[in-house]
């Protein structure tokens, strides 16, 4: 039905204590047309040096996409095709970009951080 593609982002917290403000993701949800580019941003909990990206398609559990320690991308899933890229400059926030979106990209994209 139409050419709209729905990409959702949600919050996932690992190792947060009561004083932490939590992981922040932006945008929280995004609806786009096939063929467009989408960029998601994740701001981890302060002082957390590990950051993870996951995606969850309808009716499935979360699937690992990539893992950073500080700015180094230490592990990358085969699910990250040449249209997907992630970076974490200076070990701070992280971005996940999907180029030329396809119907199969419709999912909830999650980020998490830990010590």
Curated annotation (Swiss-Prot):
GO terms for cellular component: plasma membrane; T cell receptor complex. Glycans are attached at residue 37. It comes from the Eukaryota. Keywords: Adaptive immunity, Cell membrane, Disulfide bond, Glycoprotein, Immunity, Immunoglobulin domain, Membrane, Receptor, Signal, T cell receptor. Disulfide bonds join 42-111. PROSITE patterns: IG_LIKE. Its main location: membrane. GO terms for biological process: adaptive immune response; cell surface receptor signaling pathway; immune response. Transmembrane segments: none annotated. The keyword Glycoprotein applies. GO terms for molecular function: MHC protein binding; peptide antigen binding. Residues 22-115 form the Ig-like domain. Pfam families: V-set. It is found in: Cell membrane. Residues 1-21 form the signal peptide. Alpha-beta TR is a heterodimer composed of an alpha and beta chain; disulfide-linked. The alpha-beta TR is associated with the transmembrane signaling CD3 coreceptor proteins to form the TR-CD3 (TcR or TCR). The assembly of alpha-beta TR heterodimers with CD3 occurs in the endoplasmic reticulum where a single alpha-beta TR heterodimer associates with one CD3D-CD3E heterodimer, one CD3G-CD3E heterodimer and one CD247 homodimer forming a stable octameric structure. CD3D-CD3E and CD3G-CD3E heterodimers preferentially associate with TR alpha and TR beta chains, respectively. (Microbial infection) Interacts with Staphylococcus aureus enterotoxins A/entA and H/entH. This is T cell receptor beta variable 7-9.
